[in-house]
Amino acid sequence: MPVSDGRGLDRFIAFPYDHYRDDPLWVPQLRRDMRTLLTPGKNPFFEHAEAQYWTARRADGRTVGRIGAIKNDMHNKEHNDRVGFYGFFESIDDQAVANALFDTAAAWLRTKGFDTMRGPMSPSVNDECGLLIANNGTPPSLMMPYNFPYYQALHERYGFAKAKDLLAFDGGGAQMAPERFVRLAQRAGERRGIKLRTLDMKRFDAEVELIKALYNSAWEKNWGLCR
């Protein structure tokens, strides 16, 4: 069923809370944050993008899956392709349910002129993206995807093929950076005239533009980047 009102969006947001309720590793996102992420007018992403969301429901009304289809105009302008995206995918371990969700998203993307569907992107490469296919028994990290192991099979049986390996590195949060690395960083900064300073709130807009420029420069060779 397409999400067409606030009640439908509430159901879309609520499904993972039921889906993962017995998984001790799952860390829920705040519902308020999810609503902001999904809503045009609240998320600046939708200044250059469009999305449609659906939930899958049994005859008894029980929700068994969800998906979103995303049209990212900035991506297609920058990369000159016809790639549409899907994201926010969740499903019970039932291939028929997953297929129906994938088919629905693909059909919507075809109406927008796309010939390729890529994901999960929730909703973009700057947010949660990719599918967890290894180390499912470890706690999830911030902005990293988390899903049941059977999701890989649902995708492969549908016919998806890998577009890119996405890697997450565990730095051991309780560990301090090795002293040698700290010394090297300090020397490099001194040689290049780099200084660390606090944010100047009196020049907030200029500081935001500077951070944006630094971010884009650091990530310009990252796969799928949209500036």
Residue ranges and their predicted role:
Residues 39-55:
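A short helix-loop-beta-strand connector motif used in the catalytic cores of GNAT acetyltransferases and
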